[in-house]
A protein has these predicted regions:
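Short coil-to-beta strand junction motifs in C2/discoidin
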Residues: 80-86, 156-158
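N-terminal secretory signal peptides that target proteins for export/translocation
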Residues: 1-14
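Short amphipathic, basic-aromatic surface patches that mediate peripheral association
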Residues: 71-78
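C-terminal motif of bacterial Sec signal peptides marking the signal peptidase cleavage site
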Residues: 27-30
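Bacterial signal peptide processing site
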Residues: 32-35
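Post-signal peptide N-terminal segment of mature Sec-exported envelope proteins
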Residues: 39-61
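An anionic, turn-rich surface loop/hairpin at beta-sheet edges
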Residues: 102-134
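Internal, hydrophobic beta-strand segments that form the core of beta-sheet-rich folds
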Residues: 135-151, 156-166
Length: 169
């Protein structure tokens, strides 16, 4: 068989394998339940003001379903620090249900950015709480997040995504 024919067959095999792999990934994604909550907060000009709280409200549809809570911080490579302090509070009509302070390491000790992303934008995941929780079905909740850095205007943070996902029972 001529060389150019072998190369063409190899290319077709690669496309077939890539196509089958893509279908498999699509199948896996479609099998997972949709997120319970998925909220994006974007900061104008990548500037997060100290007095600008991220506020997310939700009312659980099913109190029997445990939920994993997490957030994604997307920052640019011009962010001036290696870390990000956040104050997070969950309130209900009964008062404060959960409160914490988290120090998210956006870079390692050598200054290399943590997280995923191939360009100037990196994404870092931070869980909220210690595991899956159940919320009361007849209650409305509010999550508030403010940054705890010394800057009045924190530059380099593009957005924060709050995502709650259904846990296995």
């Amino acid at each position: 068989m001529p060389f150019f024919a072998q190369k063409h067959i190899k290319s077709a095999e690669n496309r077939l394998v890539l196509g089958l792999f893509s279908l498999f990934l699509l199948f896996l994604q479609s099998c997972s339940p949709p997120p319970v909550l998925d909220e994006l907060t974007t900061f104008e000009n990548n500037r997060w003001h100290l007095d600008s709280a991220i506020t997310v409200q939700w009312a659980p549809e099913d109190a029997e379903i445990p939920v994993f809570m997490g957030m994604y911080v997307r920052h640019l490579d011009d962010y001036p620090y290696n870390n990000l302090y956040l104050f997070r509070t969950i309130r209900s009509s009964q008062g404060v249900e959960y409160s914490d302070t988290v120090n998210i390491a956006l870079a390692d000790d050598l200054g290399r950015w943590n997280g995923t992303g191939m360009s100037t934008l990196k994404t870092v995941f931070a869980p909220i709480g210690g595991g899956a929780v159940r919320f009361k079905g007849d209650e409305r909740y509010t999550l508030s997040i403010i940054h705890g850095m010394r800057d009045t205007v924190l530059t380099g943070i593009q957005d924060v995504i709050v995502k709650f996902e259904q846990a296995e029972n």
